[in-house]
A protein has these predicted regions:
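Conserved alpha-helical scaffold segments that buttress catalytic/binding sites
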Residues: 1-278
Length: 278
Protein backbone atom coordinates (compact mmCIF):
# COMPACT_ATOMS: atom_id res chain seq x y z
CA UNK A 1 0.00 0.00 0.00
CA UNK A 2 1.38 3.39 -0.95
CA UNK A 3 1.53 5.92 1.87
CA UNK A 4 2.60 9.55 2.15
CA UNK A 5 6.38 9.84 2.06
CA UNK A 6 6.97 6.81 -0.17
CA UNK A 7 7.82 6.93 -3.85
CA UNK A 8 4.42 6.75 -5.60
CA UNK A 9 3.76 3.73 -7.79
CA UNK A 10 3.08 4.35 -11.48
CA UNK A 11 0.32 2.35 -13.21
CA UNK A 12 -0.16 2.51 -16.98
CA UNK A 13 -3.76 1.77 -18.00
CA UNK A 14 -5.47 1.46 -21.37
CA UNK A 15 -8.71 3.26 -20.45
CA UNK A 16 -9.79 5.50 -17.61
CA UNK A 17 -12.48 3.29 -16.07
CA UNK A 18 -9.68 0.86 -15.15
CA UNK A 19 -8.43 3.43 -12.63
CA UNK A 20 -11.07 2.54 -10.03
CA UNK A 21 -10.14 -1.14 -10.11
CA UNK A 22 -6.43 -0.31 -9.97
CA UNK A 23 -6.93 1.95 -6.95
CA UNK A 24 -8.80 -0.84 -5.16
CA UNK A 25 -6.12 -3.34 -6.16
CA UNK A 26 -3.46 -0.96 -4.80
CA UNK A 27 -5.28 -0.96 -1.47
CA UNK A 28 -5.58 2.82 -1.23
CA UNK A 29 -7.76 4.13 1.58
CA UNK A 30 -9.91 7.22 1.07
CA UNK A 31 -10.81 9.90 1.17
CA UNK A 32 -8.18 11.46 -1.07
CA UNK A 33 -8.06 13.97 -3.91
CA UNK A 34 -7.79 13.02 -7.56
CA UNK A 35 -5.81 15.44 -9.72
CA UNK A 36 -7.20 14.63 -13.14
CA UNK A 37 -5.25 15.95 -16.13
CA UNK A 38 -7.68 15.28 -18.94
CA UNK A 39 -9.46 16.66 -22.00
CA UNK A 40 -12.71 15.60 -20.30
CA UNK A 41 -13.92 16.02 -16.72
CA UNK A 42 -14.95 12.35 -16.31
CA UNK A 43 -17.54 13.59 -13.83
CA UNK A 44 -20.70 12.14 -15.35
CA UNK A 45 -22.88 10.27 -12.88
CA UNK A 46 -22.62 6.50 -12.44
CA UNK A 47 -25.66 4.81 -14.01
CA UNK A 48 -25.11 1.26 -12.80
CA UNK A 49 -22.39 0.46 -15.33
CA UNK A 50 -18.87 1.82 -14.92
CA UNK A 51 -17.40 3.66 -17.91
CA UNK A 52 -14.65 6.11 -18.83
CA UNK A 53 -16.85 9.11 -18.12
CA UNK A 54 -18.38 8.24 -14.74
CA UNK A 55 -15.73 6.45 -12.69
CA UNK A 56 -14.99 9.48 -10.47
CA UNK A 57 -18.59 9.74 -9.27
CA UNK A 58 -18.45 6.07 -8.30
CA UNK A 59 -15.21 6.68 -6.41
CA UNK A 60 -16.97 9.48 -4.52
CA UNK A 61 -19.89 7.16 -3.76
CA UNK A 62 -17.47 4.58 -2.36
CA UNK A 63 -15.84 7.15 -0.09
CA UNK A 64 -12.53 7.07 -1.95
CA UNK A 65 -12.57 10.60 -3.37
CA UNK A 66 -13.76 13.83 -1.75
CA UNK A 67 -11.85 16.37 -3.86
CA UNK A 68 -11.13 16.69 -7.56
CA UNK A 69 -8.78 19.06 -9.33
CA UNK A 70 -9.55 18.93 -13.04
CA UNK A 71 -6.68 20.30 -15.13
CA UNK A 72 -8.25 20.89 -18.53
CA UNK A 73 -7.19 22.09 -21.95
CA UNK A 74 -8.49 25.38 -23.31
CA UNK A 75 -10.47 23.34 -25.84
CA UNK A 76 -12.22 21.26 -23.17
CA UNK A 77 -15.88 21.68 -22.25
CA UNK A 78 -18.01 20.22 -19.40
CA UNK A 79 -17.28 22.88 -16.72
CA UNK A 80 -16.04 26.45 -16.65
CA UNK A 81 -12.98 27.25 -14.56
CA UNK A 82 -13.78 27.79 -10.90
CA UNK A 83 -14.66 26.13 -7.61
CA UNK A 84 -17.73 23.94 -7.08
CA UNK A 85 -19.03 22.21 -3.97
CA UNK A 86 -21.88 19.72 -4.36
CA UNK A 87 -23.30 16.40 -3.26
CA UNK A 88 -23.29 13.08 -5.10
CA UNK A 89 -25.61 10.30 -4.01
CA UNK A 90 -28.11 7.57 -4.84
CA UNK A 91 -31.33 8.70 -6.48
CA UNK A 92 -33.40 5.59 -5.75
CA UNK A 93 -33.23 4.41 -9.37
CA UNK A 94 -31.20 1.25 -8.83
CA UNK A 95 -27.51 2.08 -8.48
CA UNK A 96 -27.83 5.37 -10.36
CA UNK A 97 -26.15 8.41 -8.84
CA UNK A 98 -27.24 12.03 -9.05
CA UNK A 99 -25.46 15.36 -8.64
CA UNK A 100 -26.81 18.38 -6.76
CA UNK A 101 -24.75 20.77 -8.92
CA UNK A 102 -27.09 22.85 -11.07
CA UNK A 103 -25.13 23.17 -14.34
CA UNK A 104 -25.77 22.18 -17.99
CA UNK A 105 -23.32 19.25 -17.80
CA UNK A 106 -25.66 17.51 -15.37
CA UNK A 107 -28.91 18.71 -16.95
CA UNK A 108 -27.82 17.22 -20.27
CA UNK A 109 -27.82 13.57 -19.20
CA UNK A 110 -30.51 14.00 -16.56
CA UNK A 111 -27.88 13.57 -13.85
CA UNK A 112 -29.04 16.56 -11.81
CA UNK A 113 -30.89 15.87 -8.57
CA UNK A 114 -31.50 18.42 -5.79
CA UNK A 115 -29.96 17.54 -2.43
CA UNK A 116 -33.31 16.67 -0.88
CA UNK A 117 -33.87 14.05 -3.61
CA UNK A 118 -30.66 12.15 -2.83
CA UNK A 119 -31.10 9.08 -0.64
CA UNK A 120 -27.39 8.99 0.19
CA UNK A 121 -25.02 11.93 0.05
CA UNK A 122 -21.27 12.51 -0.17
CA UNK A 123 -19.68 15.90 -0.70
CA UNK A 124 -17.28 16.67 -3.54
CA UNK A 125 -15.10 19.78 -3.77
CA UNK A 126 -14.25 20.38 -7.43
CA UNK A 127 -11.65 22.81 -8.74
CA UNK A 128 -11.42 23.38 -12.50
CA UNK A 129 -8.36 25.11 -13.94
CA UNK A 130 -7.06 25.83 -17.44
CA UNK A 131 -4.41 28.48 -16.77
CA UNK A 132 -1.50 26.72 -15.06
CA UNK A 133 0.53 29.86 -14.37
CA UNK A 134 -0.90 30.11 -10.84
CA UNK A 135 -0.64 27.14 -8.43
CA UNK A 136 -3.67 25.69 -6.64
CA UNK A 137 -2.46 24.59 -3.21
CA UNK A 138 -3.65 21.59 -1.19
CA UNK A 139 -2.03 19.47 1.52
CA UNK A 140 -4.46 16.57 1.07
CA UNK A 141 -3.46 13.03 0.17
CA UNK A 142 -3.82 12.75 -3.61
CA UNK A 143 -3.45 10.62 -6.70
CA UNK A 144 -2.35 11.91 -10.09
CA UNK A 145 -4.28 10.75 -13.15
CA UNK A 146 -2.99 11.79 -16.57
CA UNK A 147 -5.09 11.02 -19.62
CA UNK A 148 -2.99 11.30 -22.76
CA UNK A 149 -5.89 12.97 -24.59
CA UNK A 150 -4.98 16.14 -22.65
CA UNK A 151 -2.05 16.47 -25.05
CA UNK A 152 -4.11 15.89 -28.18
CA UNK A 153 -7.79 14.96 -28.28
CA UNK A 154 -9.84 13.40 -31.07
CA UNK A 155 -13.60 13.62 -31.39
CA UNK A 156 -14.89 10.12 -32.26
CA UNK A 157 -18.10 11.80 -33.48
CA UNK A 158 -16.29 14.25 -35.77
CA UNK A 159 -18.02 13.04 -38.95
CA UNK A 160 -21.46 13.48 -37.37
CA UNK A 161 -20.46 16.97 -36.25
CA UNK A 162 -19.39 17.84 -39.80
CA UNK A 163 -22.82 16.77 -41.07
CA UNK A 164 -24.51 18.84 -38.38
CA UNK A 165 -22.44 21.89 -39.36
CA UNK A 166 -23.48 21.43 -42.99
CA UNK A 167 -27.10 21.22 -41.88
CA UNK A 168 -27.42 24.22 -39.55
CA UNK A 169 -24.07 26.02 -39.73
CA UNK A 170 -21.14 26.36 -37.35
CA UNK A 171 -22.28 29.80 -36.18
CA UNK A 172 -25.66 28.45 -35.05
CA UNK A 173 -24.02 25.60 -33.14
CA UNK A 174 -21.59 28.03 -31.50
CA UNK A 175 -24.43 30.36 -30.50
CA UNK A 176 -26.45 27.50 -28.99
CA UNK A 177 -23.41 26.22 -27.07
CA UNK A 178 -22.61 29.67 -25.68
CA UNK A 179 -26.20 30.28 -24.62
CA UNK A 180 -26.60 26.81 -23.12
CA UNK A 181 -23.40 27.15 -21.09
CA UNK A 182 -24.81 30.06 -19.10
CA UNK A 183 -27.97 28.26 -17.91
CA UNK A 184 -28.10 27.50 -14.18
CA UNK A 185 -31.61 26.17 -13.52
CA UNK A 186 -33.34 23.02 -14.70
CA UNK A 187 -36.45 24.96 -15.76
CA UNK A 188 -34.40 27.27 -18.00
CA UNK A 189 -32.60 24.25 -19.45
CA UNK A 190 -35.85 22.50 -20.32
CA UNK A 191 -37.18 25.65 -21.97
CA UNK A 192 -33.93 26.02 -23.93
CA UNK A 193 -34.14 22.42 -25.11
CA UNK A 194 -37.83 22.70 -26.05
CA UNK A 195 -37.17 25.87 -28.07
CA UNK A 196 -34.49 24.10 -30.11
CA UNK A 197 -36.62 21.01 -30.65
CA UNK A 198 -39.50 23.16 -31.90
CA UNK A 199 -37.13 24.86 -34.33
CA UNK A 200 -35.67 21.57 -35.59
CA UNK A 201 -36.80 18.28 -34.02
CA UNK A 202 -33.92 16.04 -32.99
CA UNK A 203 -31.24 18.69 -33.46
CA UNK A 204 -30.65 19.25 -29.74
CA UNK A 205 -29.88 15.59 -29.03
CA UNK A 206 -27.75 15.29 -32.17
CA UNK A 207 -25.64 18.34 -31.31
CA UNK A 208 -25.07 17.21 -27.73
CA UNK A 209 -24.00 13.75 -28.88
CA UNK A 210 -21.36 14.96 -31.35
CA UNK A 211 -20.16 18.25 -29.81
CA UNK A 212 -17.00 17.02 -28.09
CA UNK A 213 -13.55 18.58 -27.61
CA UNK A 214 -11.05 18.15 -30.43
CA UNK A 215 -7.56 19.64 -30.58
CA UNK A 216 -4.09 18.69 -31.75
CA UNK A 217 -0.58 19.84 -30.88
CA UNK A 218 2.84 19.60 -32.51
CA UNK A 219 5.69 17.73 -30.80
CA UNK A 220 7.11 21.03 -29.54
CA UNK A 221 3.72 22.08 -28.18
CA UNK A 222 3.26 18.72 -26.42
CA UNK A 223 6.63 19.16 -24.76
CA UNK A 224 5.62 22.68 -23.77
CA UNK A 225 2.40 21.42 -22.18
CA UNK A 226 4.34 18.81 -20.20
CA UNK A 227 6.77 21.48 -18.92
CA UNK A 228 3.88 23.76 -17.97
CA UNK A 229 2.07 20.91 -16.21
CA UNK A 230 5.27 19.89 -14.41
CA UNK A 231 5.75 23.38 -13.00
CA UNK A 232 2.12 23.59 -11.91
CA UNK A 233 2.13 20.22 -10.13
CA UNK A 234 5.46 20.90 -8.39
CA UNK A 235 4.15 24.23 -7.06
CA UNK A 236 0.65 22.99 -6.19
CA UNK A 237 1.14 19.58 -4.56
CA UNK A 238 3.54 17.76 -2.22
CA UNK A 239 4.84 14.61 -3.92
CA UNK A 240 5.22 13.06 -0.44
CA UNK A 241 1.41 13.08 -0.16
CA UNK A 242 0.94 11.37 -3.53
CA UNK A 243 -0.53 7.87 -3.19
CA UNK A 244 -0.18 6.83 -6.81
CA UNK A 245 0.27 7.97 -10.41
CA UNK A 246 -1.96 6.64 -13.19
CA UNK A 247 -1.24 7.12 -16.90
CA UNK A 248 -4.13 6.53 -19.30
CA UNK A 249 -3.70 5.77 -23.02
CA UNK A 250 -7.31 6.37 -24.22
CA UNK A 251 -6.37 5.13 -27.69
CA UNK A 252 -8.92 2.32 -27.86
CA UNK A 253 -11.79 4.68 -27.00
CA UNK A 254 -10.67 6.94 -29.86
CA UNK A 255 -9.89 10.05 -27.82
CA UNK A 256 -6.08 9.96 -28.03
CA UNK A 257 -4.64 10.05 -31.55
CA UNK A 258 -2.73 6.79 -32.03
CA UNK A 259 -0.24 8.60 -34.28
CA UNK A 260 0.67 10.94 -31.41
CA UNK A 261 0.58 8.38 -28.60
CA UNK A 262 4.25 7.36 -28.64
CA UNK A 263 5.61 10.89 -28.38
CA UNK A 264 3.08 11.83 -25.69
CA UNK A 265 4.03 8.72 -23.74
CA UNK A 266 7.75 9.50 -24.00
CA UNK A 267 7.35 13.12 -22.84
CA UNK A 268 5.05 12.28 -19.94
CA UNK A 269 7.12 9.38 -18.62
CA UNK A 270 10.32 11.43 -18.71
CA UNK A 271 8.62 14.04 -16.51
CA UNK A 272 7.07 11.44 -14.19
CA UNK A 273 10.52 9.97 -13.51
CA UNK A 274 11.74 13.41 -12.42
CA UNK A 275 8.61 13.94 -10.32
CA UNK A 276 9.09 10.68 -8.43
CA UNK A 277 12.84 11.06 -7.99
CA UNK A 278 13.43 14.82 -7.58
Amino acid sequence: VATGGSIPKVSHLKEHDELLWQVLDDGLQGPFEIVNVDAHSDLAMFTGQLDIGNFISKMVDLGLVDRTLWVKDKGSMDFMDGFYNFAIGRTGEGLRLGSSLSVPFYFLNEDYAPRNALITSRELALTVVTDLSKPVFSDAKWILSIDYDYFGCRNPQAKDLEEMIKMIGAETISTLYTKGSTIRTLVEWQEFRNDIDRMAPGVFTAICRCLLPSFTYSTEEIMGKVVELSSFIHKSRDINNCLGIYLIDSVGSGFTDSAKHAEIDKCVKAWIDRLRYP
